């Protein structure tokens, strides 16, 4: 989960200042709304020409706490912030290329019919694919040196809505004819999955001199991996329009996978898994549910993995205070008075989230996100401590605490790299904070996507893993929501004992695991938000064991 350093509305008060929330908010908003007032335009299109004052009055159905919070927000927003309507996320400049090795037309795939076991004809794959095309480029491994394996890159095109999602596929280093396929998703919302590729689990990393450094613990050691930049306008992806909620992005991902496996049936017969971290705790339940909803599909989905995710905010936000105040296994970051303030803020935060859960309205969900993020994330950020790793300070404010993100961006902005991958945009950025704010102001942040998990558990196994040094999506909250989830196997899961996780023939454990039915939770020691980066060997171990079915219900 990425928090914009430029907007206090996301809880990102300046780490360099200990001033009060209101003073910081006024300063940040005054500086930023002149150049990016589109980031906080009214969330509903029908109110695009109104001011905060007028659209507030239109929603008498809001509860008193939500109304009060909108009043507070209005005091912080400059009067000219809504002078004219603008798009949330600015379209990226892009130039279409013609040098593709394959173009798969969704309309052609949609026309394919097969005869079922009952003798009746039905479409080979379900879903609406007519408007989608998939473009594929064979990447020459020798040009970039990221890996020696077979690679493909390209775009999924939604021609009707002018959306173009970039992907990069790496074949397994081991046995690609039989090894599973994994889709990897980073979060944000609005952050490129190429971060996961080069910072965490891909075949190579990028050093300070922009050199490619091989990763011996890459997740494609025993699986083929697809890295996807989504939603649109993230990383190398682009559009003239915007995606502002998780559900809309799910249709795109289903189309991409369907067309990819149609073009490459040699990978379609293998087991397929979706893995991701952070805001992918929102994405993955929706994407998996979308795939499973299609009876006729060529996607052999076998499990999902969510690492340090945001999935059930009502339960998870309760655990920011314990994690920041010394109850998560690491020393306290906040003072006793700050911890008491967080305790005092919890009832209001939970009331706002419950109202969001019940109504689903942006007018309830936006205040919940704004209030709770400022009360529970803001105080921590003001200390200068890394929100993604409680063990140290933020080393680079301009690159989400990690200088390596800047190196990755510089590498991916090189012309020879973009040409080798068939990139159509003018440049790359690791995170698009317009998208981040867009999702916030569409009410997506606090939505109860955990409610989809019981339905997924009926079909396939689910793994929740969490590095225990992360603050932003900490292990306490992830363990708590997995135990609070209402599903038929709840009692058995909660009674299951935590067992040691360790490498084969190793005496030292690297975490704990509990599993029952199709549900598994892991706590990974000495790892922050990005577990594969901090514990590369251990993360590859539990990945391979998970893909091998060690904790699957028999």
From Swiss-Prot:
Any one GO BP annotation for this protein: proteolysis
Disulfide bonds listed in the record: 191-431, 325-339, 349-372, 356-365, 394-401
Organism: Neurospora crassa (strain ATCC 24698 / 74-OR23-1A / CBS 708.71 / DSM 1257 / FGSC 987)
Keyword annotations of the record: Carboxypeptidase, Disulfide bond, Glycoprotein, Hydrolase, Protease, Signal, Vacuole, Zymogen
Enzyme Commission no: 3.4.16.5
Residues modified by glycosylation: 222, 518
InterPro entries: AB_hydrolase_fold, Peptidase_S10, Propeptide_carboxypepY, Ser_caboxypep_ser_AS
Cellular localization per UniProt: Vacuole
An annotated Gene Ontology molecular function: serine-type carboxypeptidase activity
Propeptide residues, chain positions: 18-137
Domain of life: Eukaryota
Keyword Iron: no
Family stated for the protein in its record: Belongs to the peptidase S10 family.
Catalytic reactions on record: Release of a C-terminal amino acid with broad specificity
Active site per UniProt: 278, 470, 529
Name of the featured protein: Carboxypeptidase Y homolog A
Signal peptide start-end: 1-17
Job description of the protein: Vacuolar carboxypeptidase involved in degradation of small peptides. Digests preferentially peptides containing an aliphatic or hydrophobic residue in P1' position, as well as methionine, leucine or phenylalanine in P1 position of ester substrate.
GO cellular component: fungal-type vacuole
EC class name: hydrolase
